[in-house]
Amino acid sequence: NDNLEQQATVLVNRYLSVITETVAFSEIIDFVNGFAFQSRTYLPAGQYRIITIKNVQDGKIDSTGASCIDCLPQRMKTNCILQIGDVLLSLTGNVGRVGIVCENNLLLNQRVAKFVPHRKELLPFLYFIFRHPSIKTQMESIAKGTAQLNLSPIETLNLSVPFEKTKALELSKVLSPIYQFIISNNQQNILLSSLRDELLPKLMSGEIDISDIKI
C-alpha cells in the first residue's frame, strides 16, 4: 500500500499547488463520534469488535486485540456500526491518524471520529487530504493535553483546506481506484493473517502433517 499512498500523494500535491481558494472542513465534511461502551460488557470473543484509538493506524484499521460484544447497546446509534470503506480519525494519543475500515462487524468507540462527507463521492479525496503531512501537522498543532494529546472535532472541522468543488470532485474520481485498491490489499492481508493464525498452531502441534509435500 505504500506505493499506492505515494501515487496518491503526488496527485494531492499537484492539486494543492494550484488551488488557492480555501474553505473550512466543516463546509465539506462532518464527523460522527463513537459510542461510550461499558467495559463490563466486553467479551474475549464475540460477534462485534470495538474499534478504539489504538486500532486506528496510519492507512488502516487494525482490529487485532479489539474487545468484543455479542449484543448491540440499545442507546447506540446505528451510525456507530462501521461499514467497509468508512474512514476513521484518532482524536486522542497519536492524534490525526487516519485509516480505512476493511472488515465487517466493527463498532465505533468514543474518541474515534468517522468521516461523513457532505458529498459521498468526496470520501477518497478527503481520506488522502487528511493523510497529507500538511493537514496532519495542522491537527497536531491544535491538539491539547499534557499526559495525552486530545484533538477537538470542532476545532478540526474549523481548519482550512484548499478546495474548489469541481477540481476536488475530479481528483476524488481519479483517487477512487487507488482507495479501492488499498481496501482490497488490506482485506487480503487480513485473510492471510487469519489463515496463518489458524494453521500455524496446527502445524506446530502436528495436527497437520506436511512431510509428504514435495516442493
Predicted segments — roles?
Residues 1-36, 162, 166-211:
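Non-catalytic DNA-recognition/assembly elements of restriction-modification systems
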Residues 26-41, 54-84, 103:
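Sequence-specific dsDNA recognition surfaces
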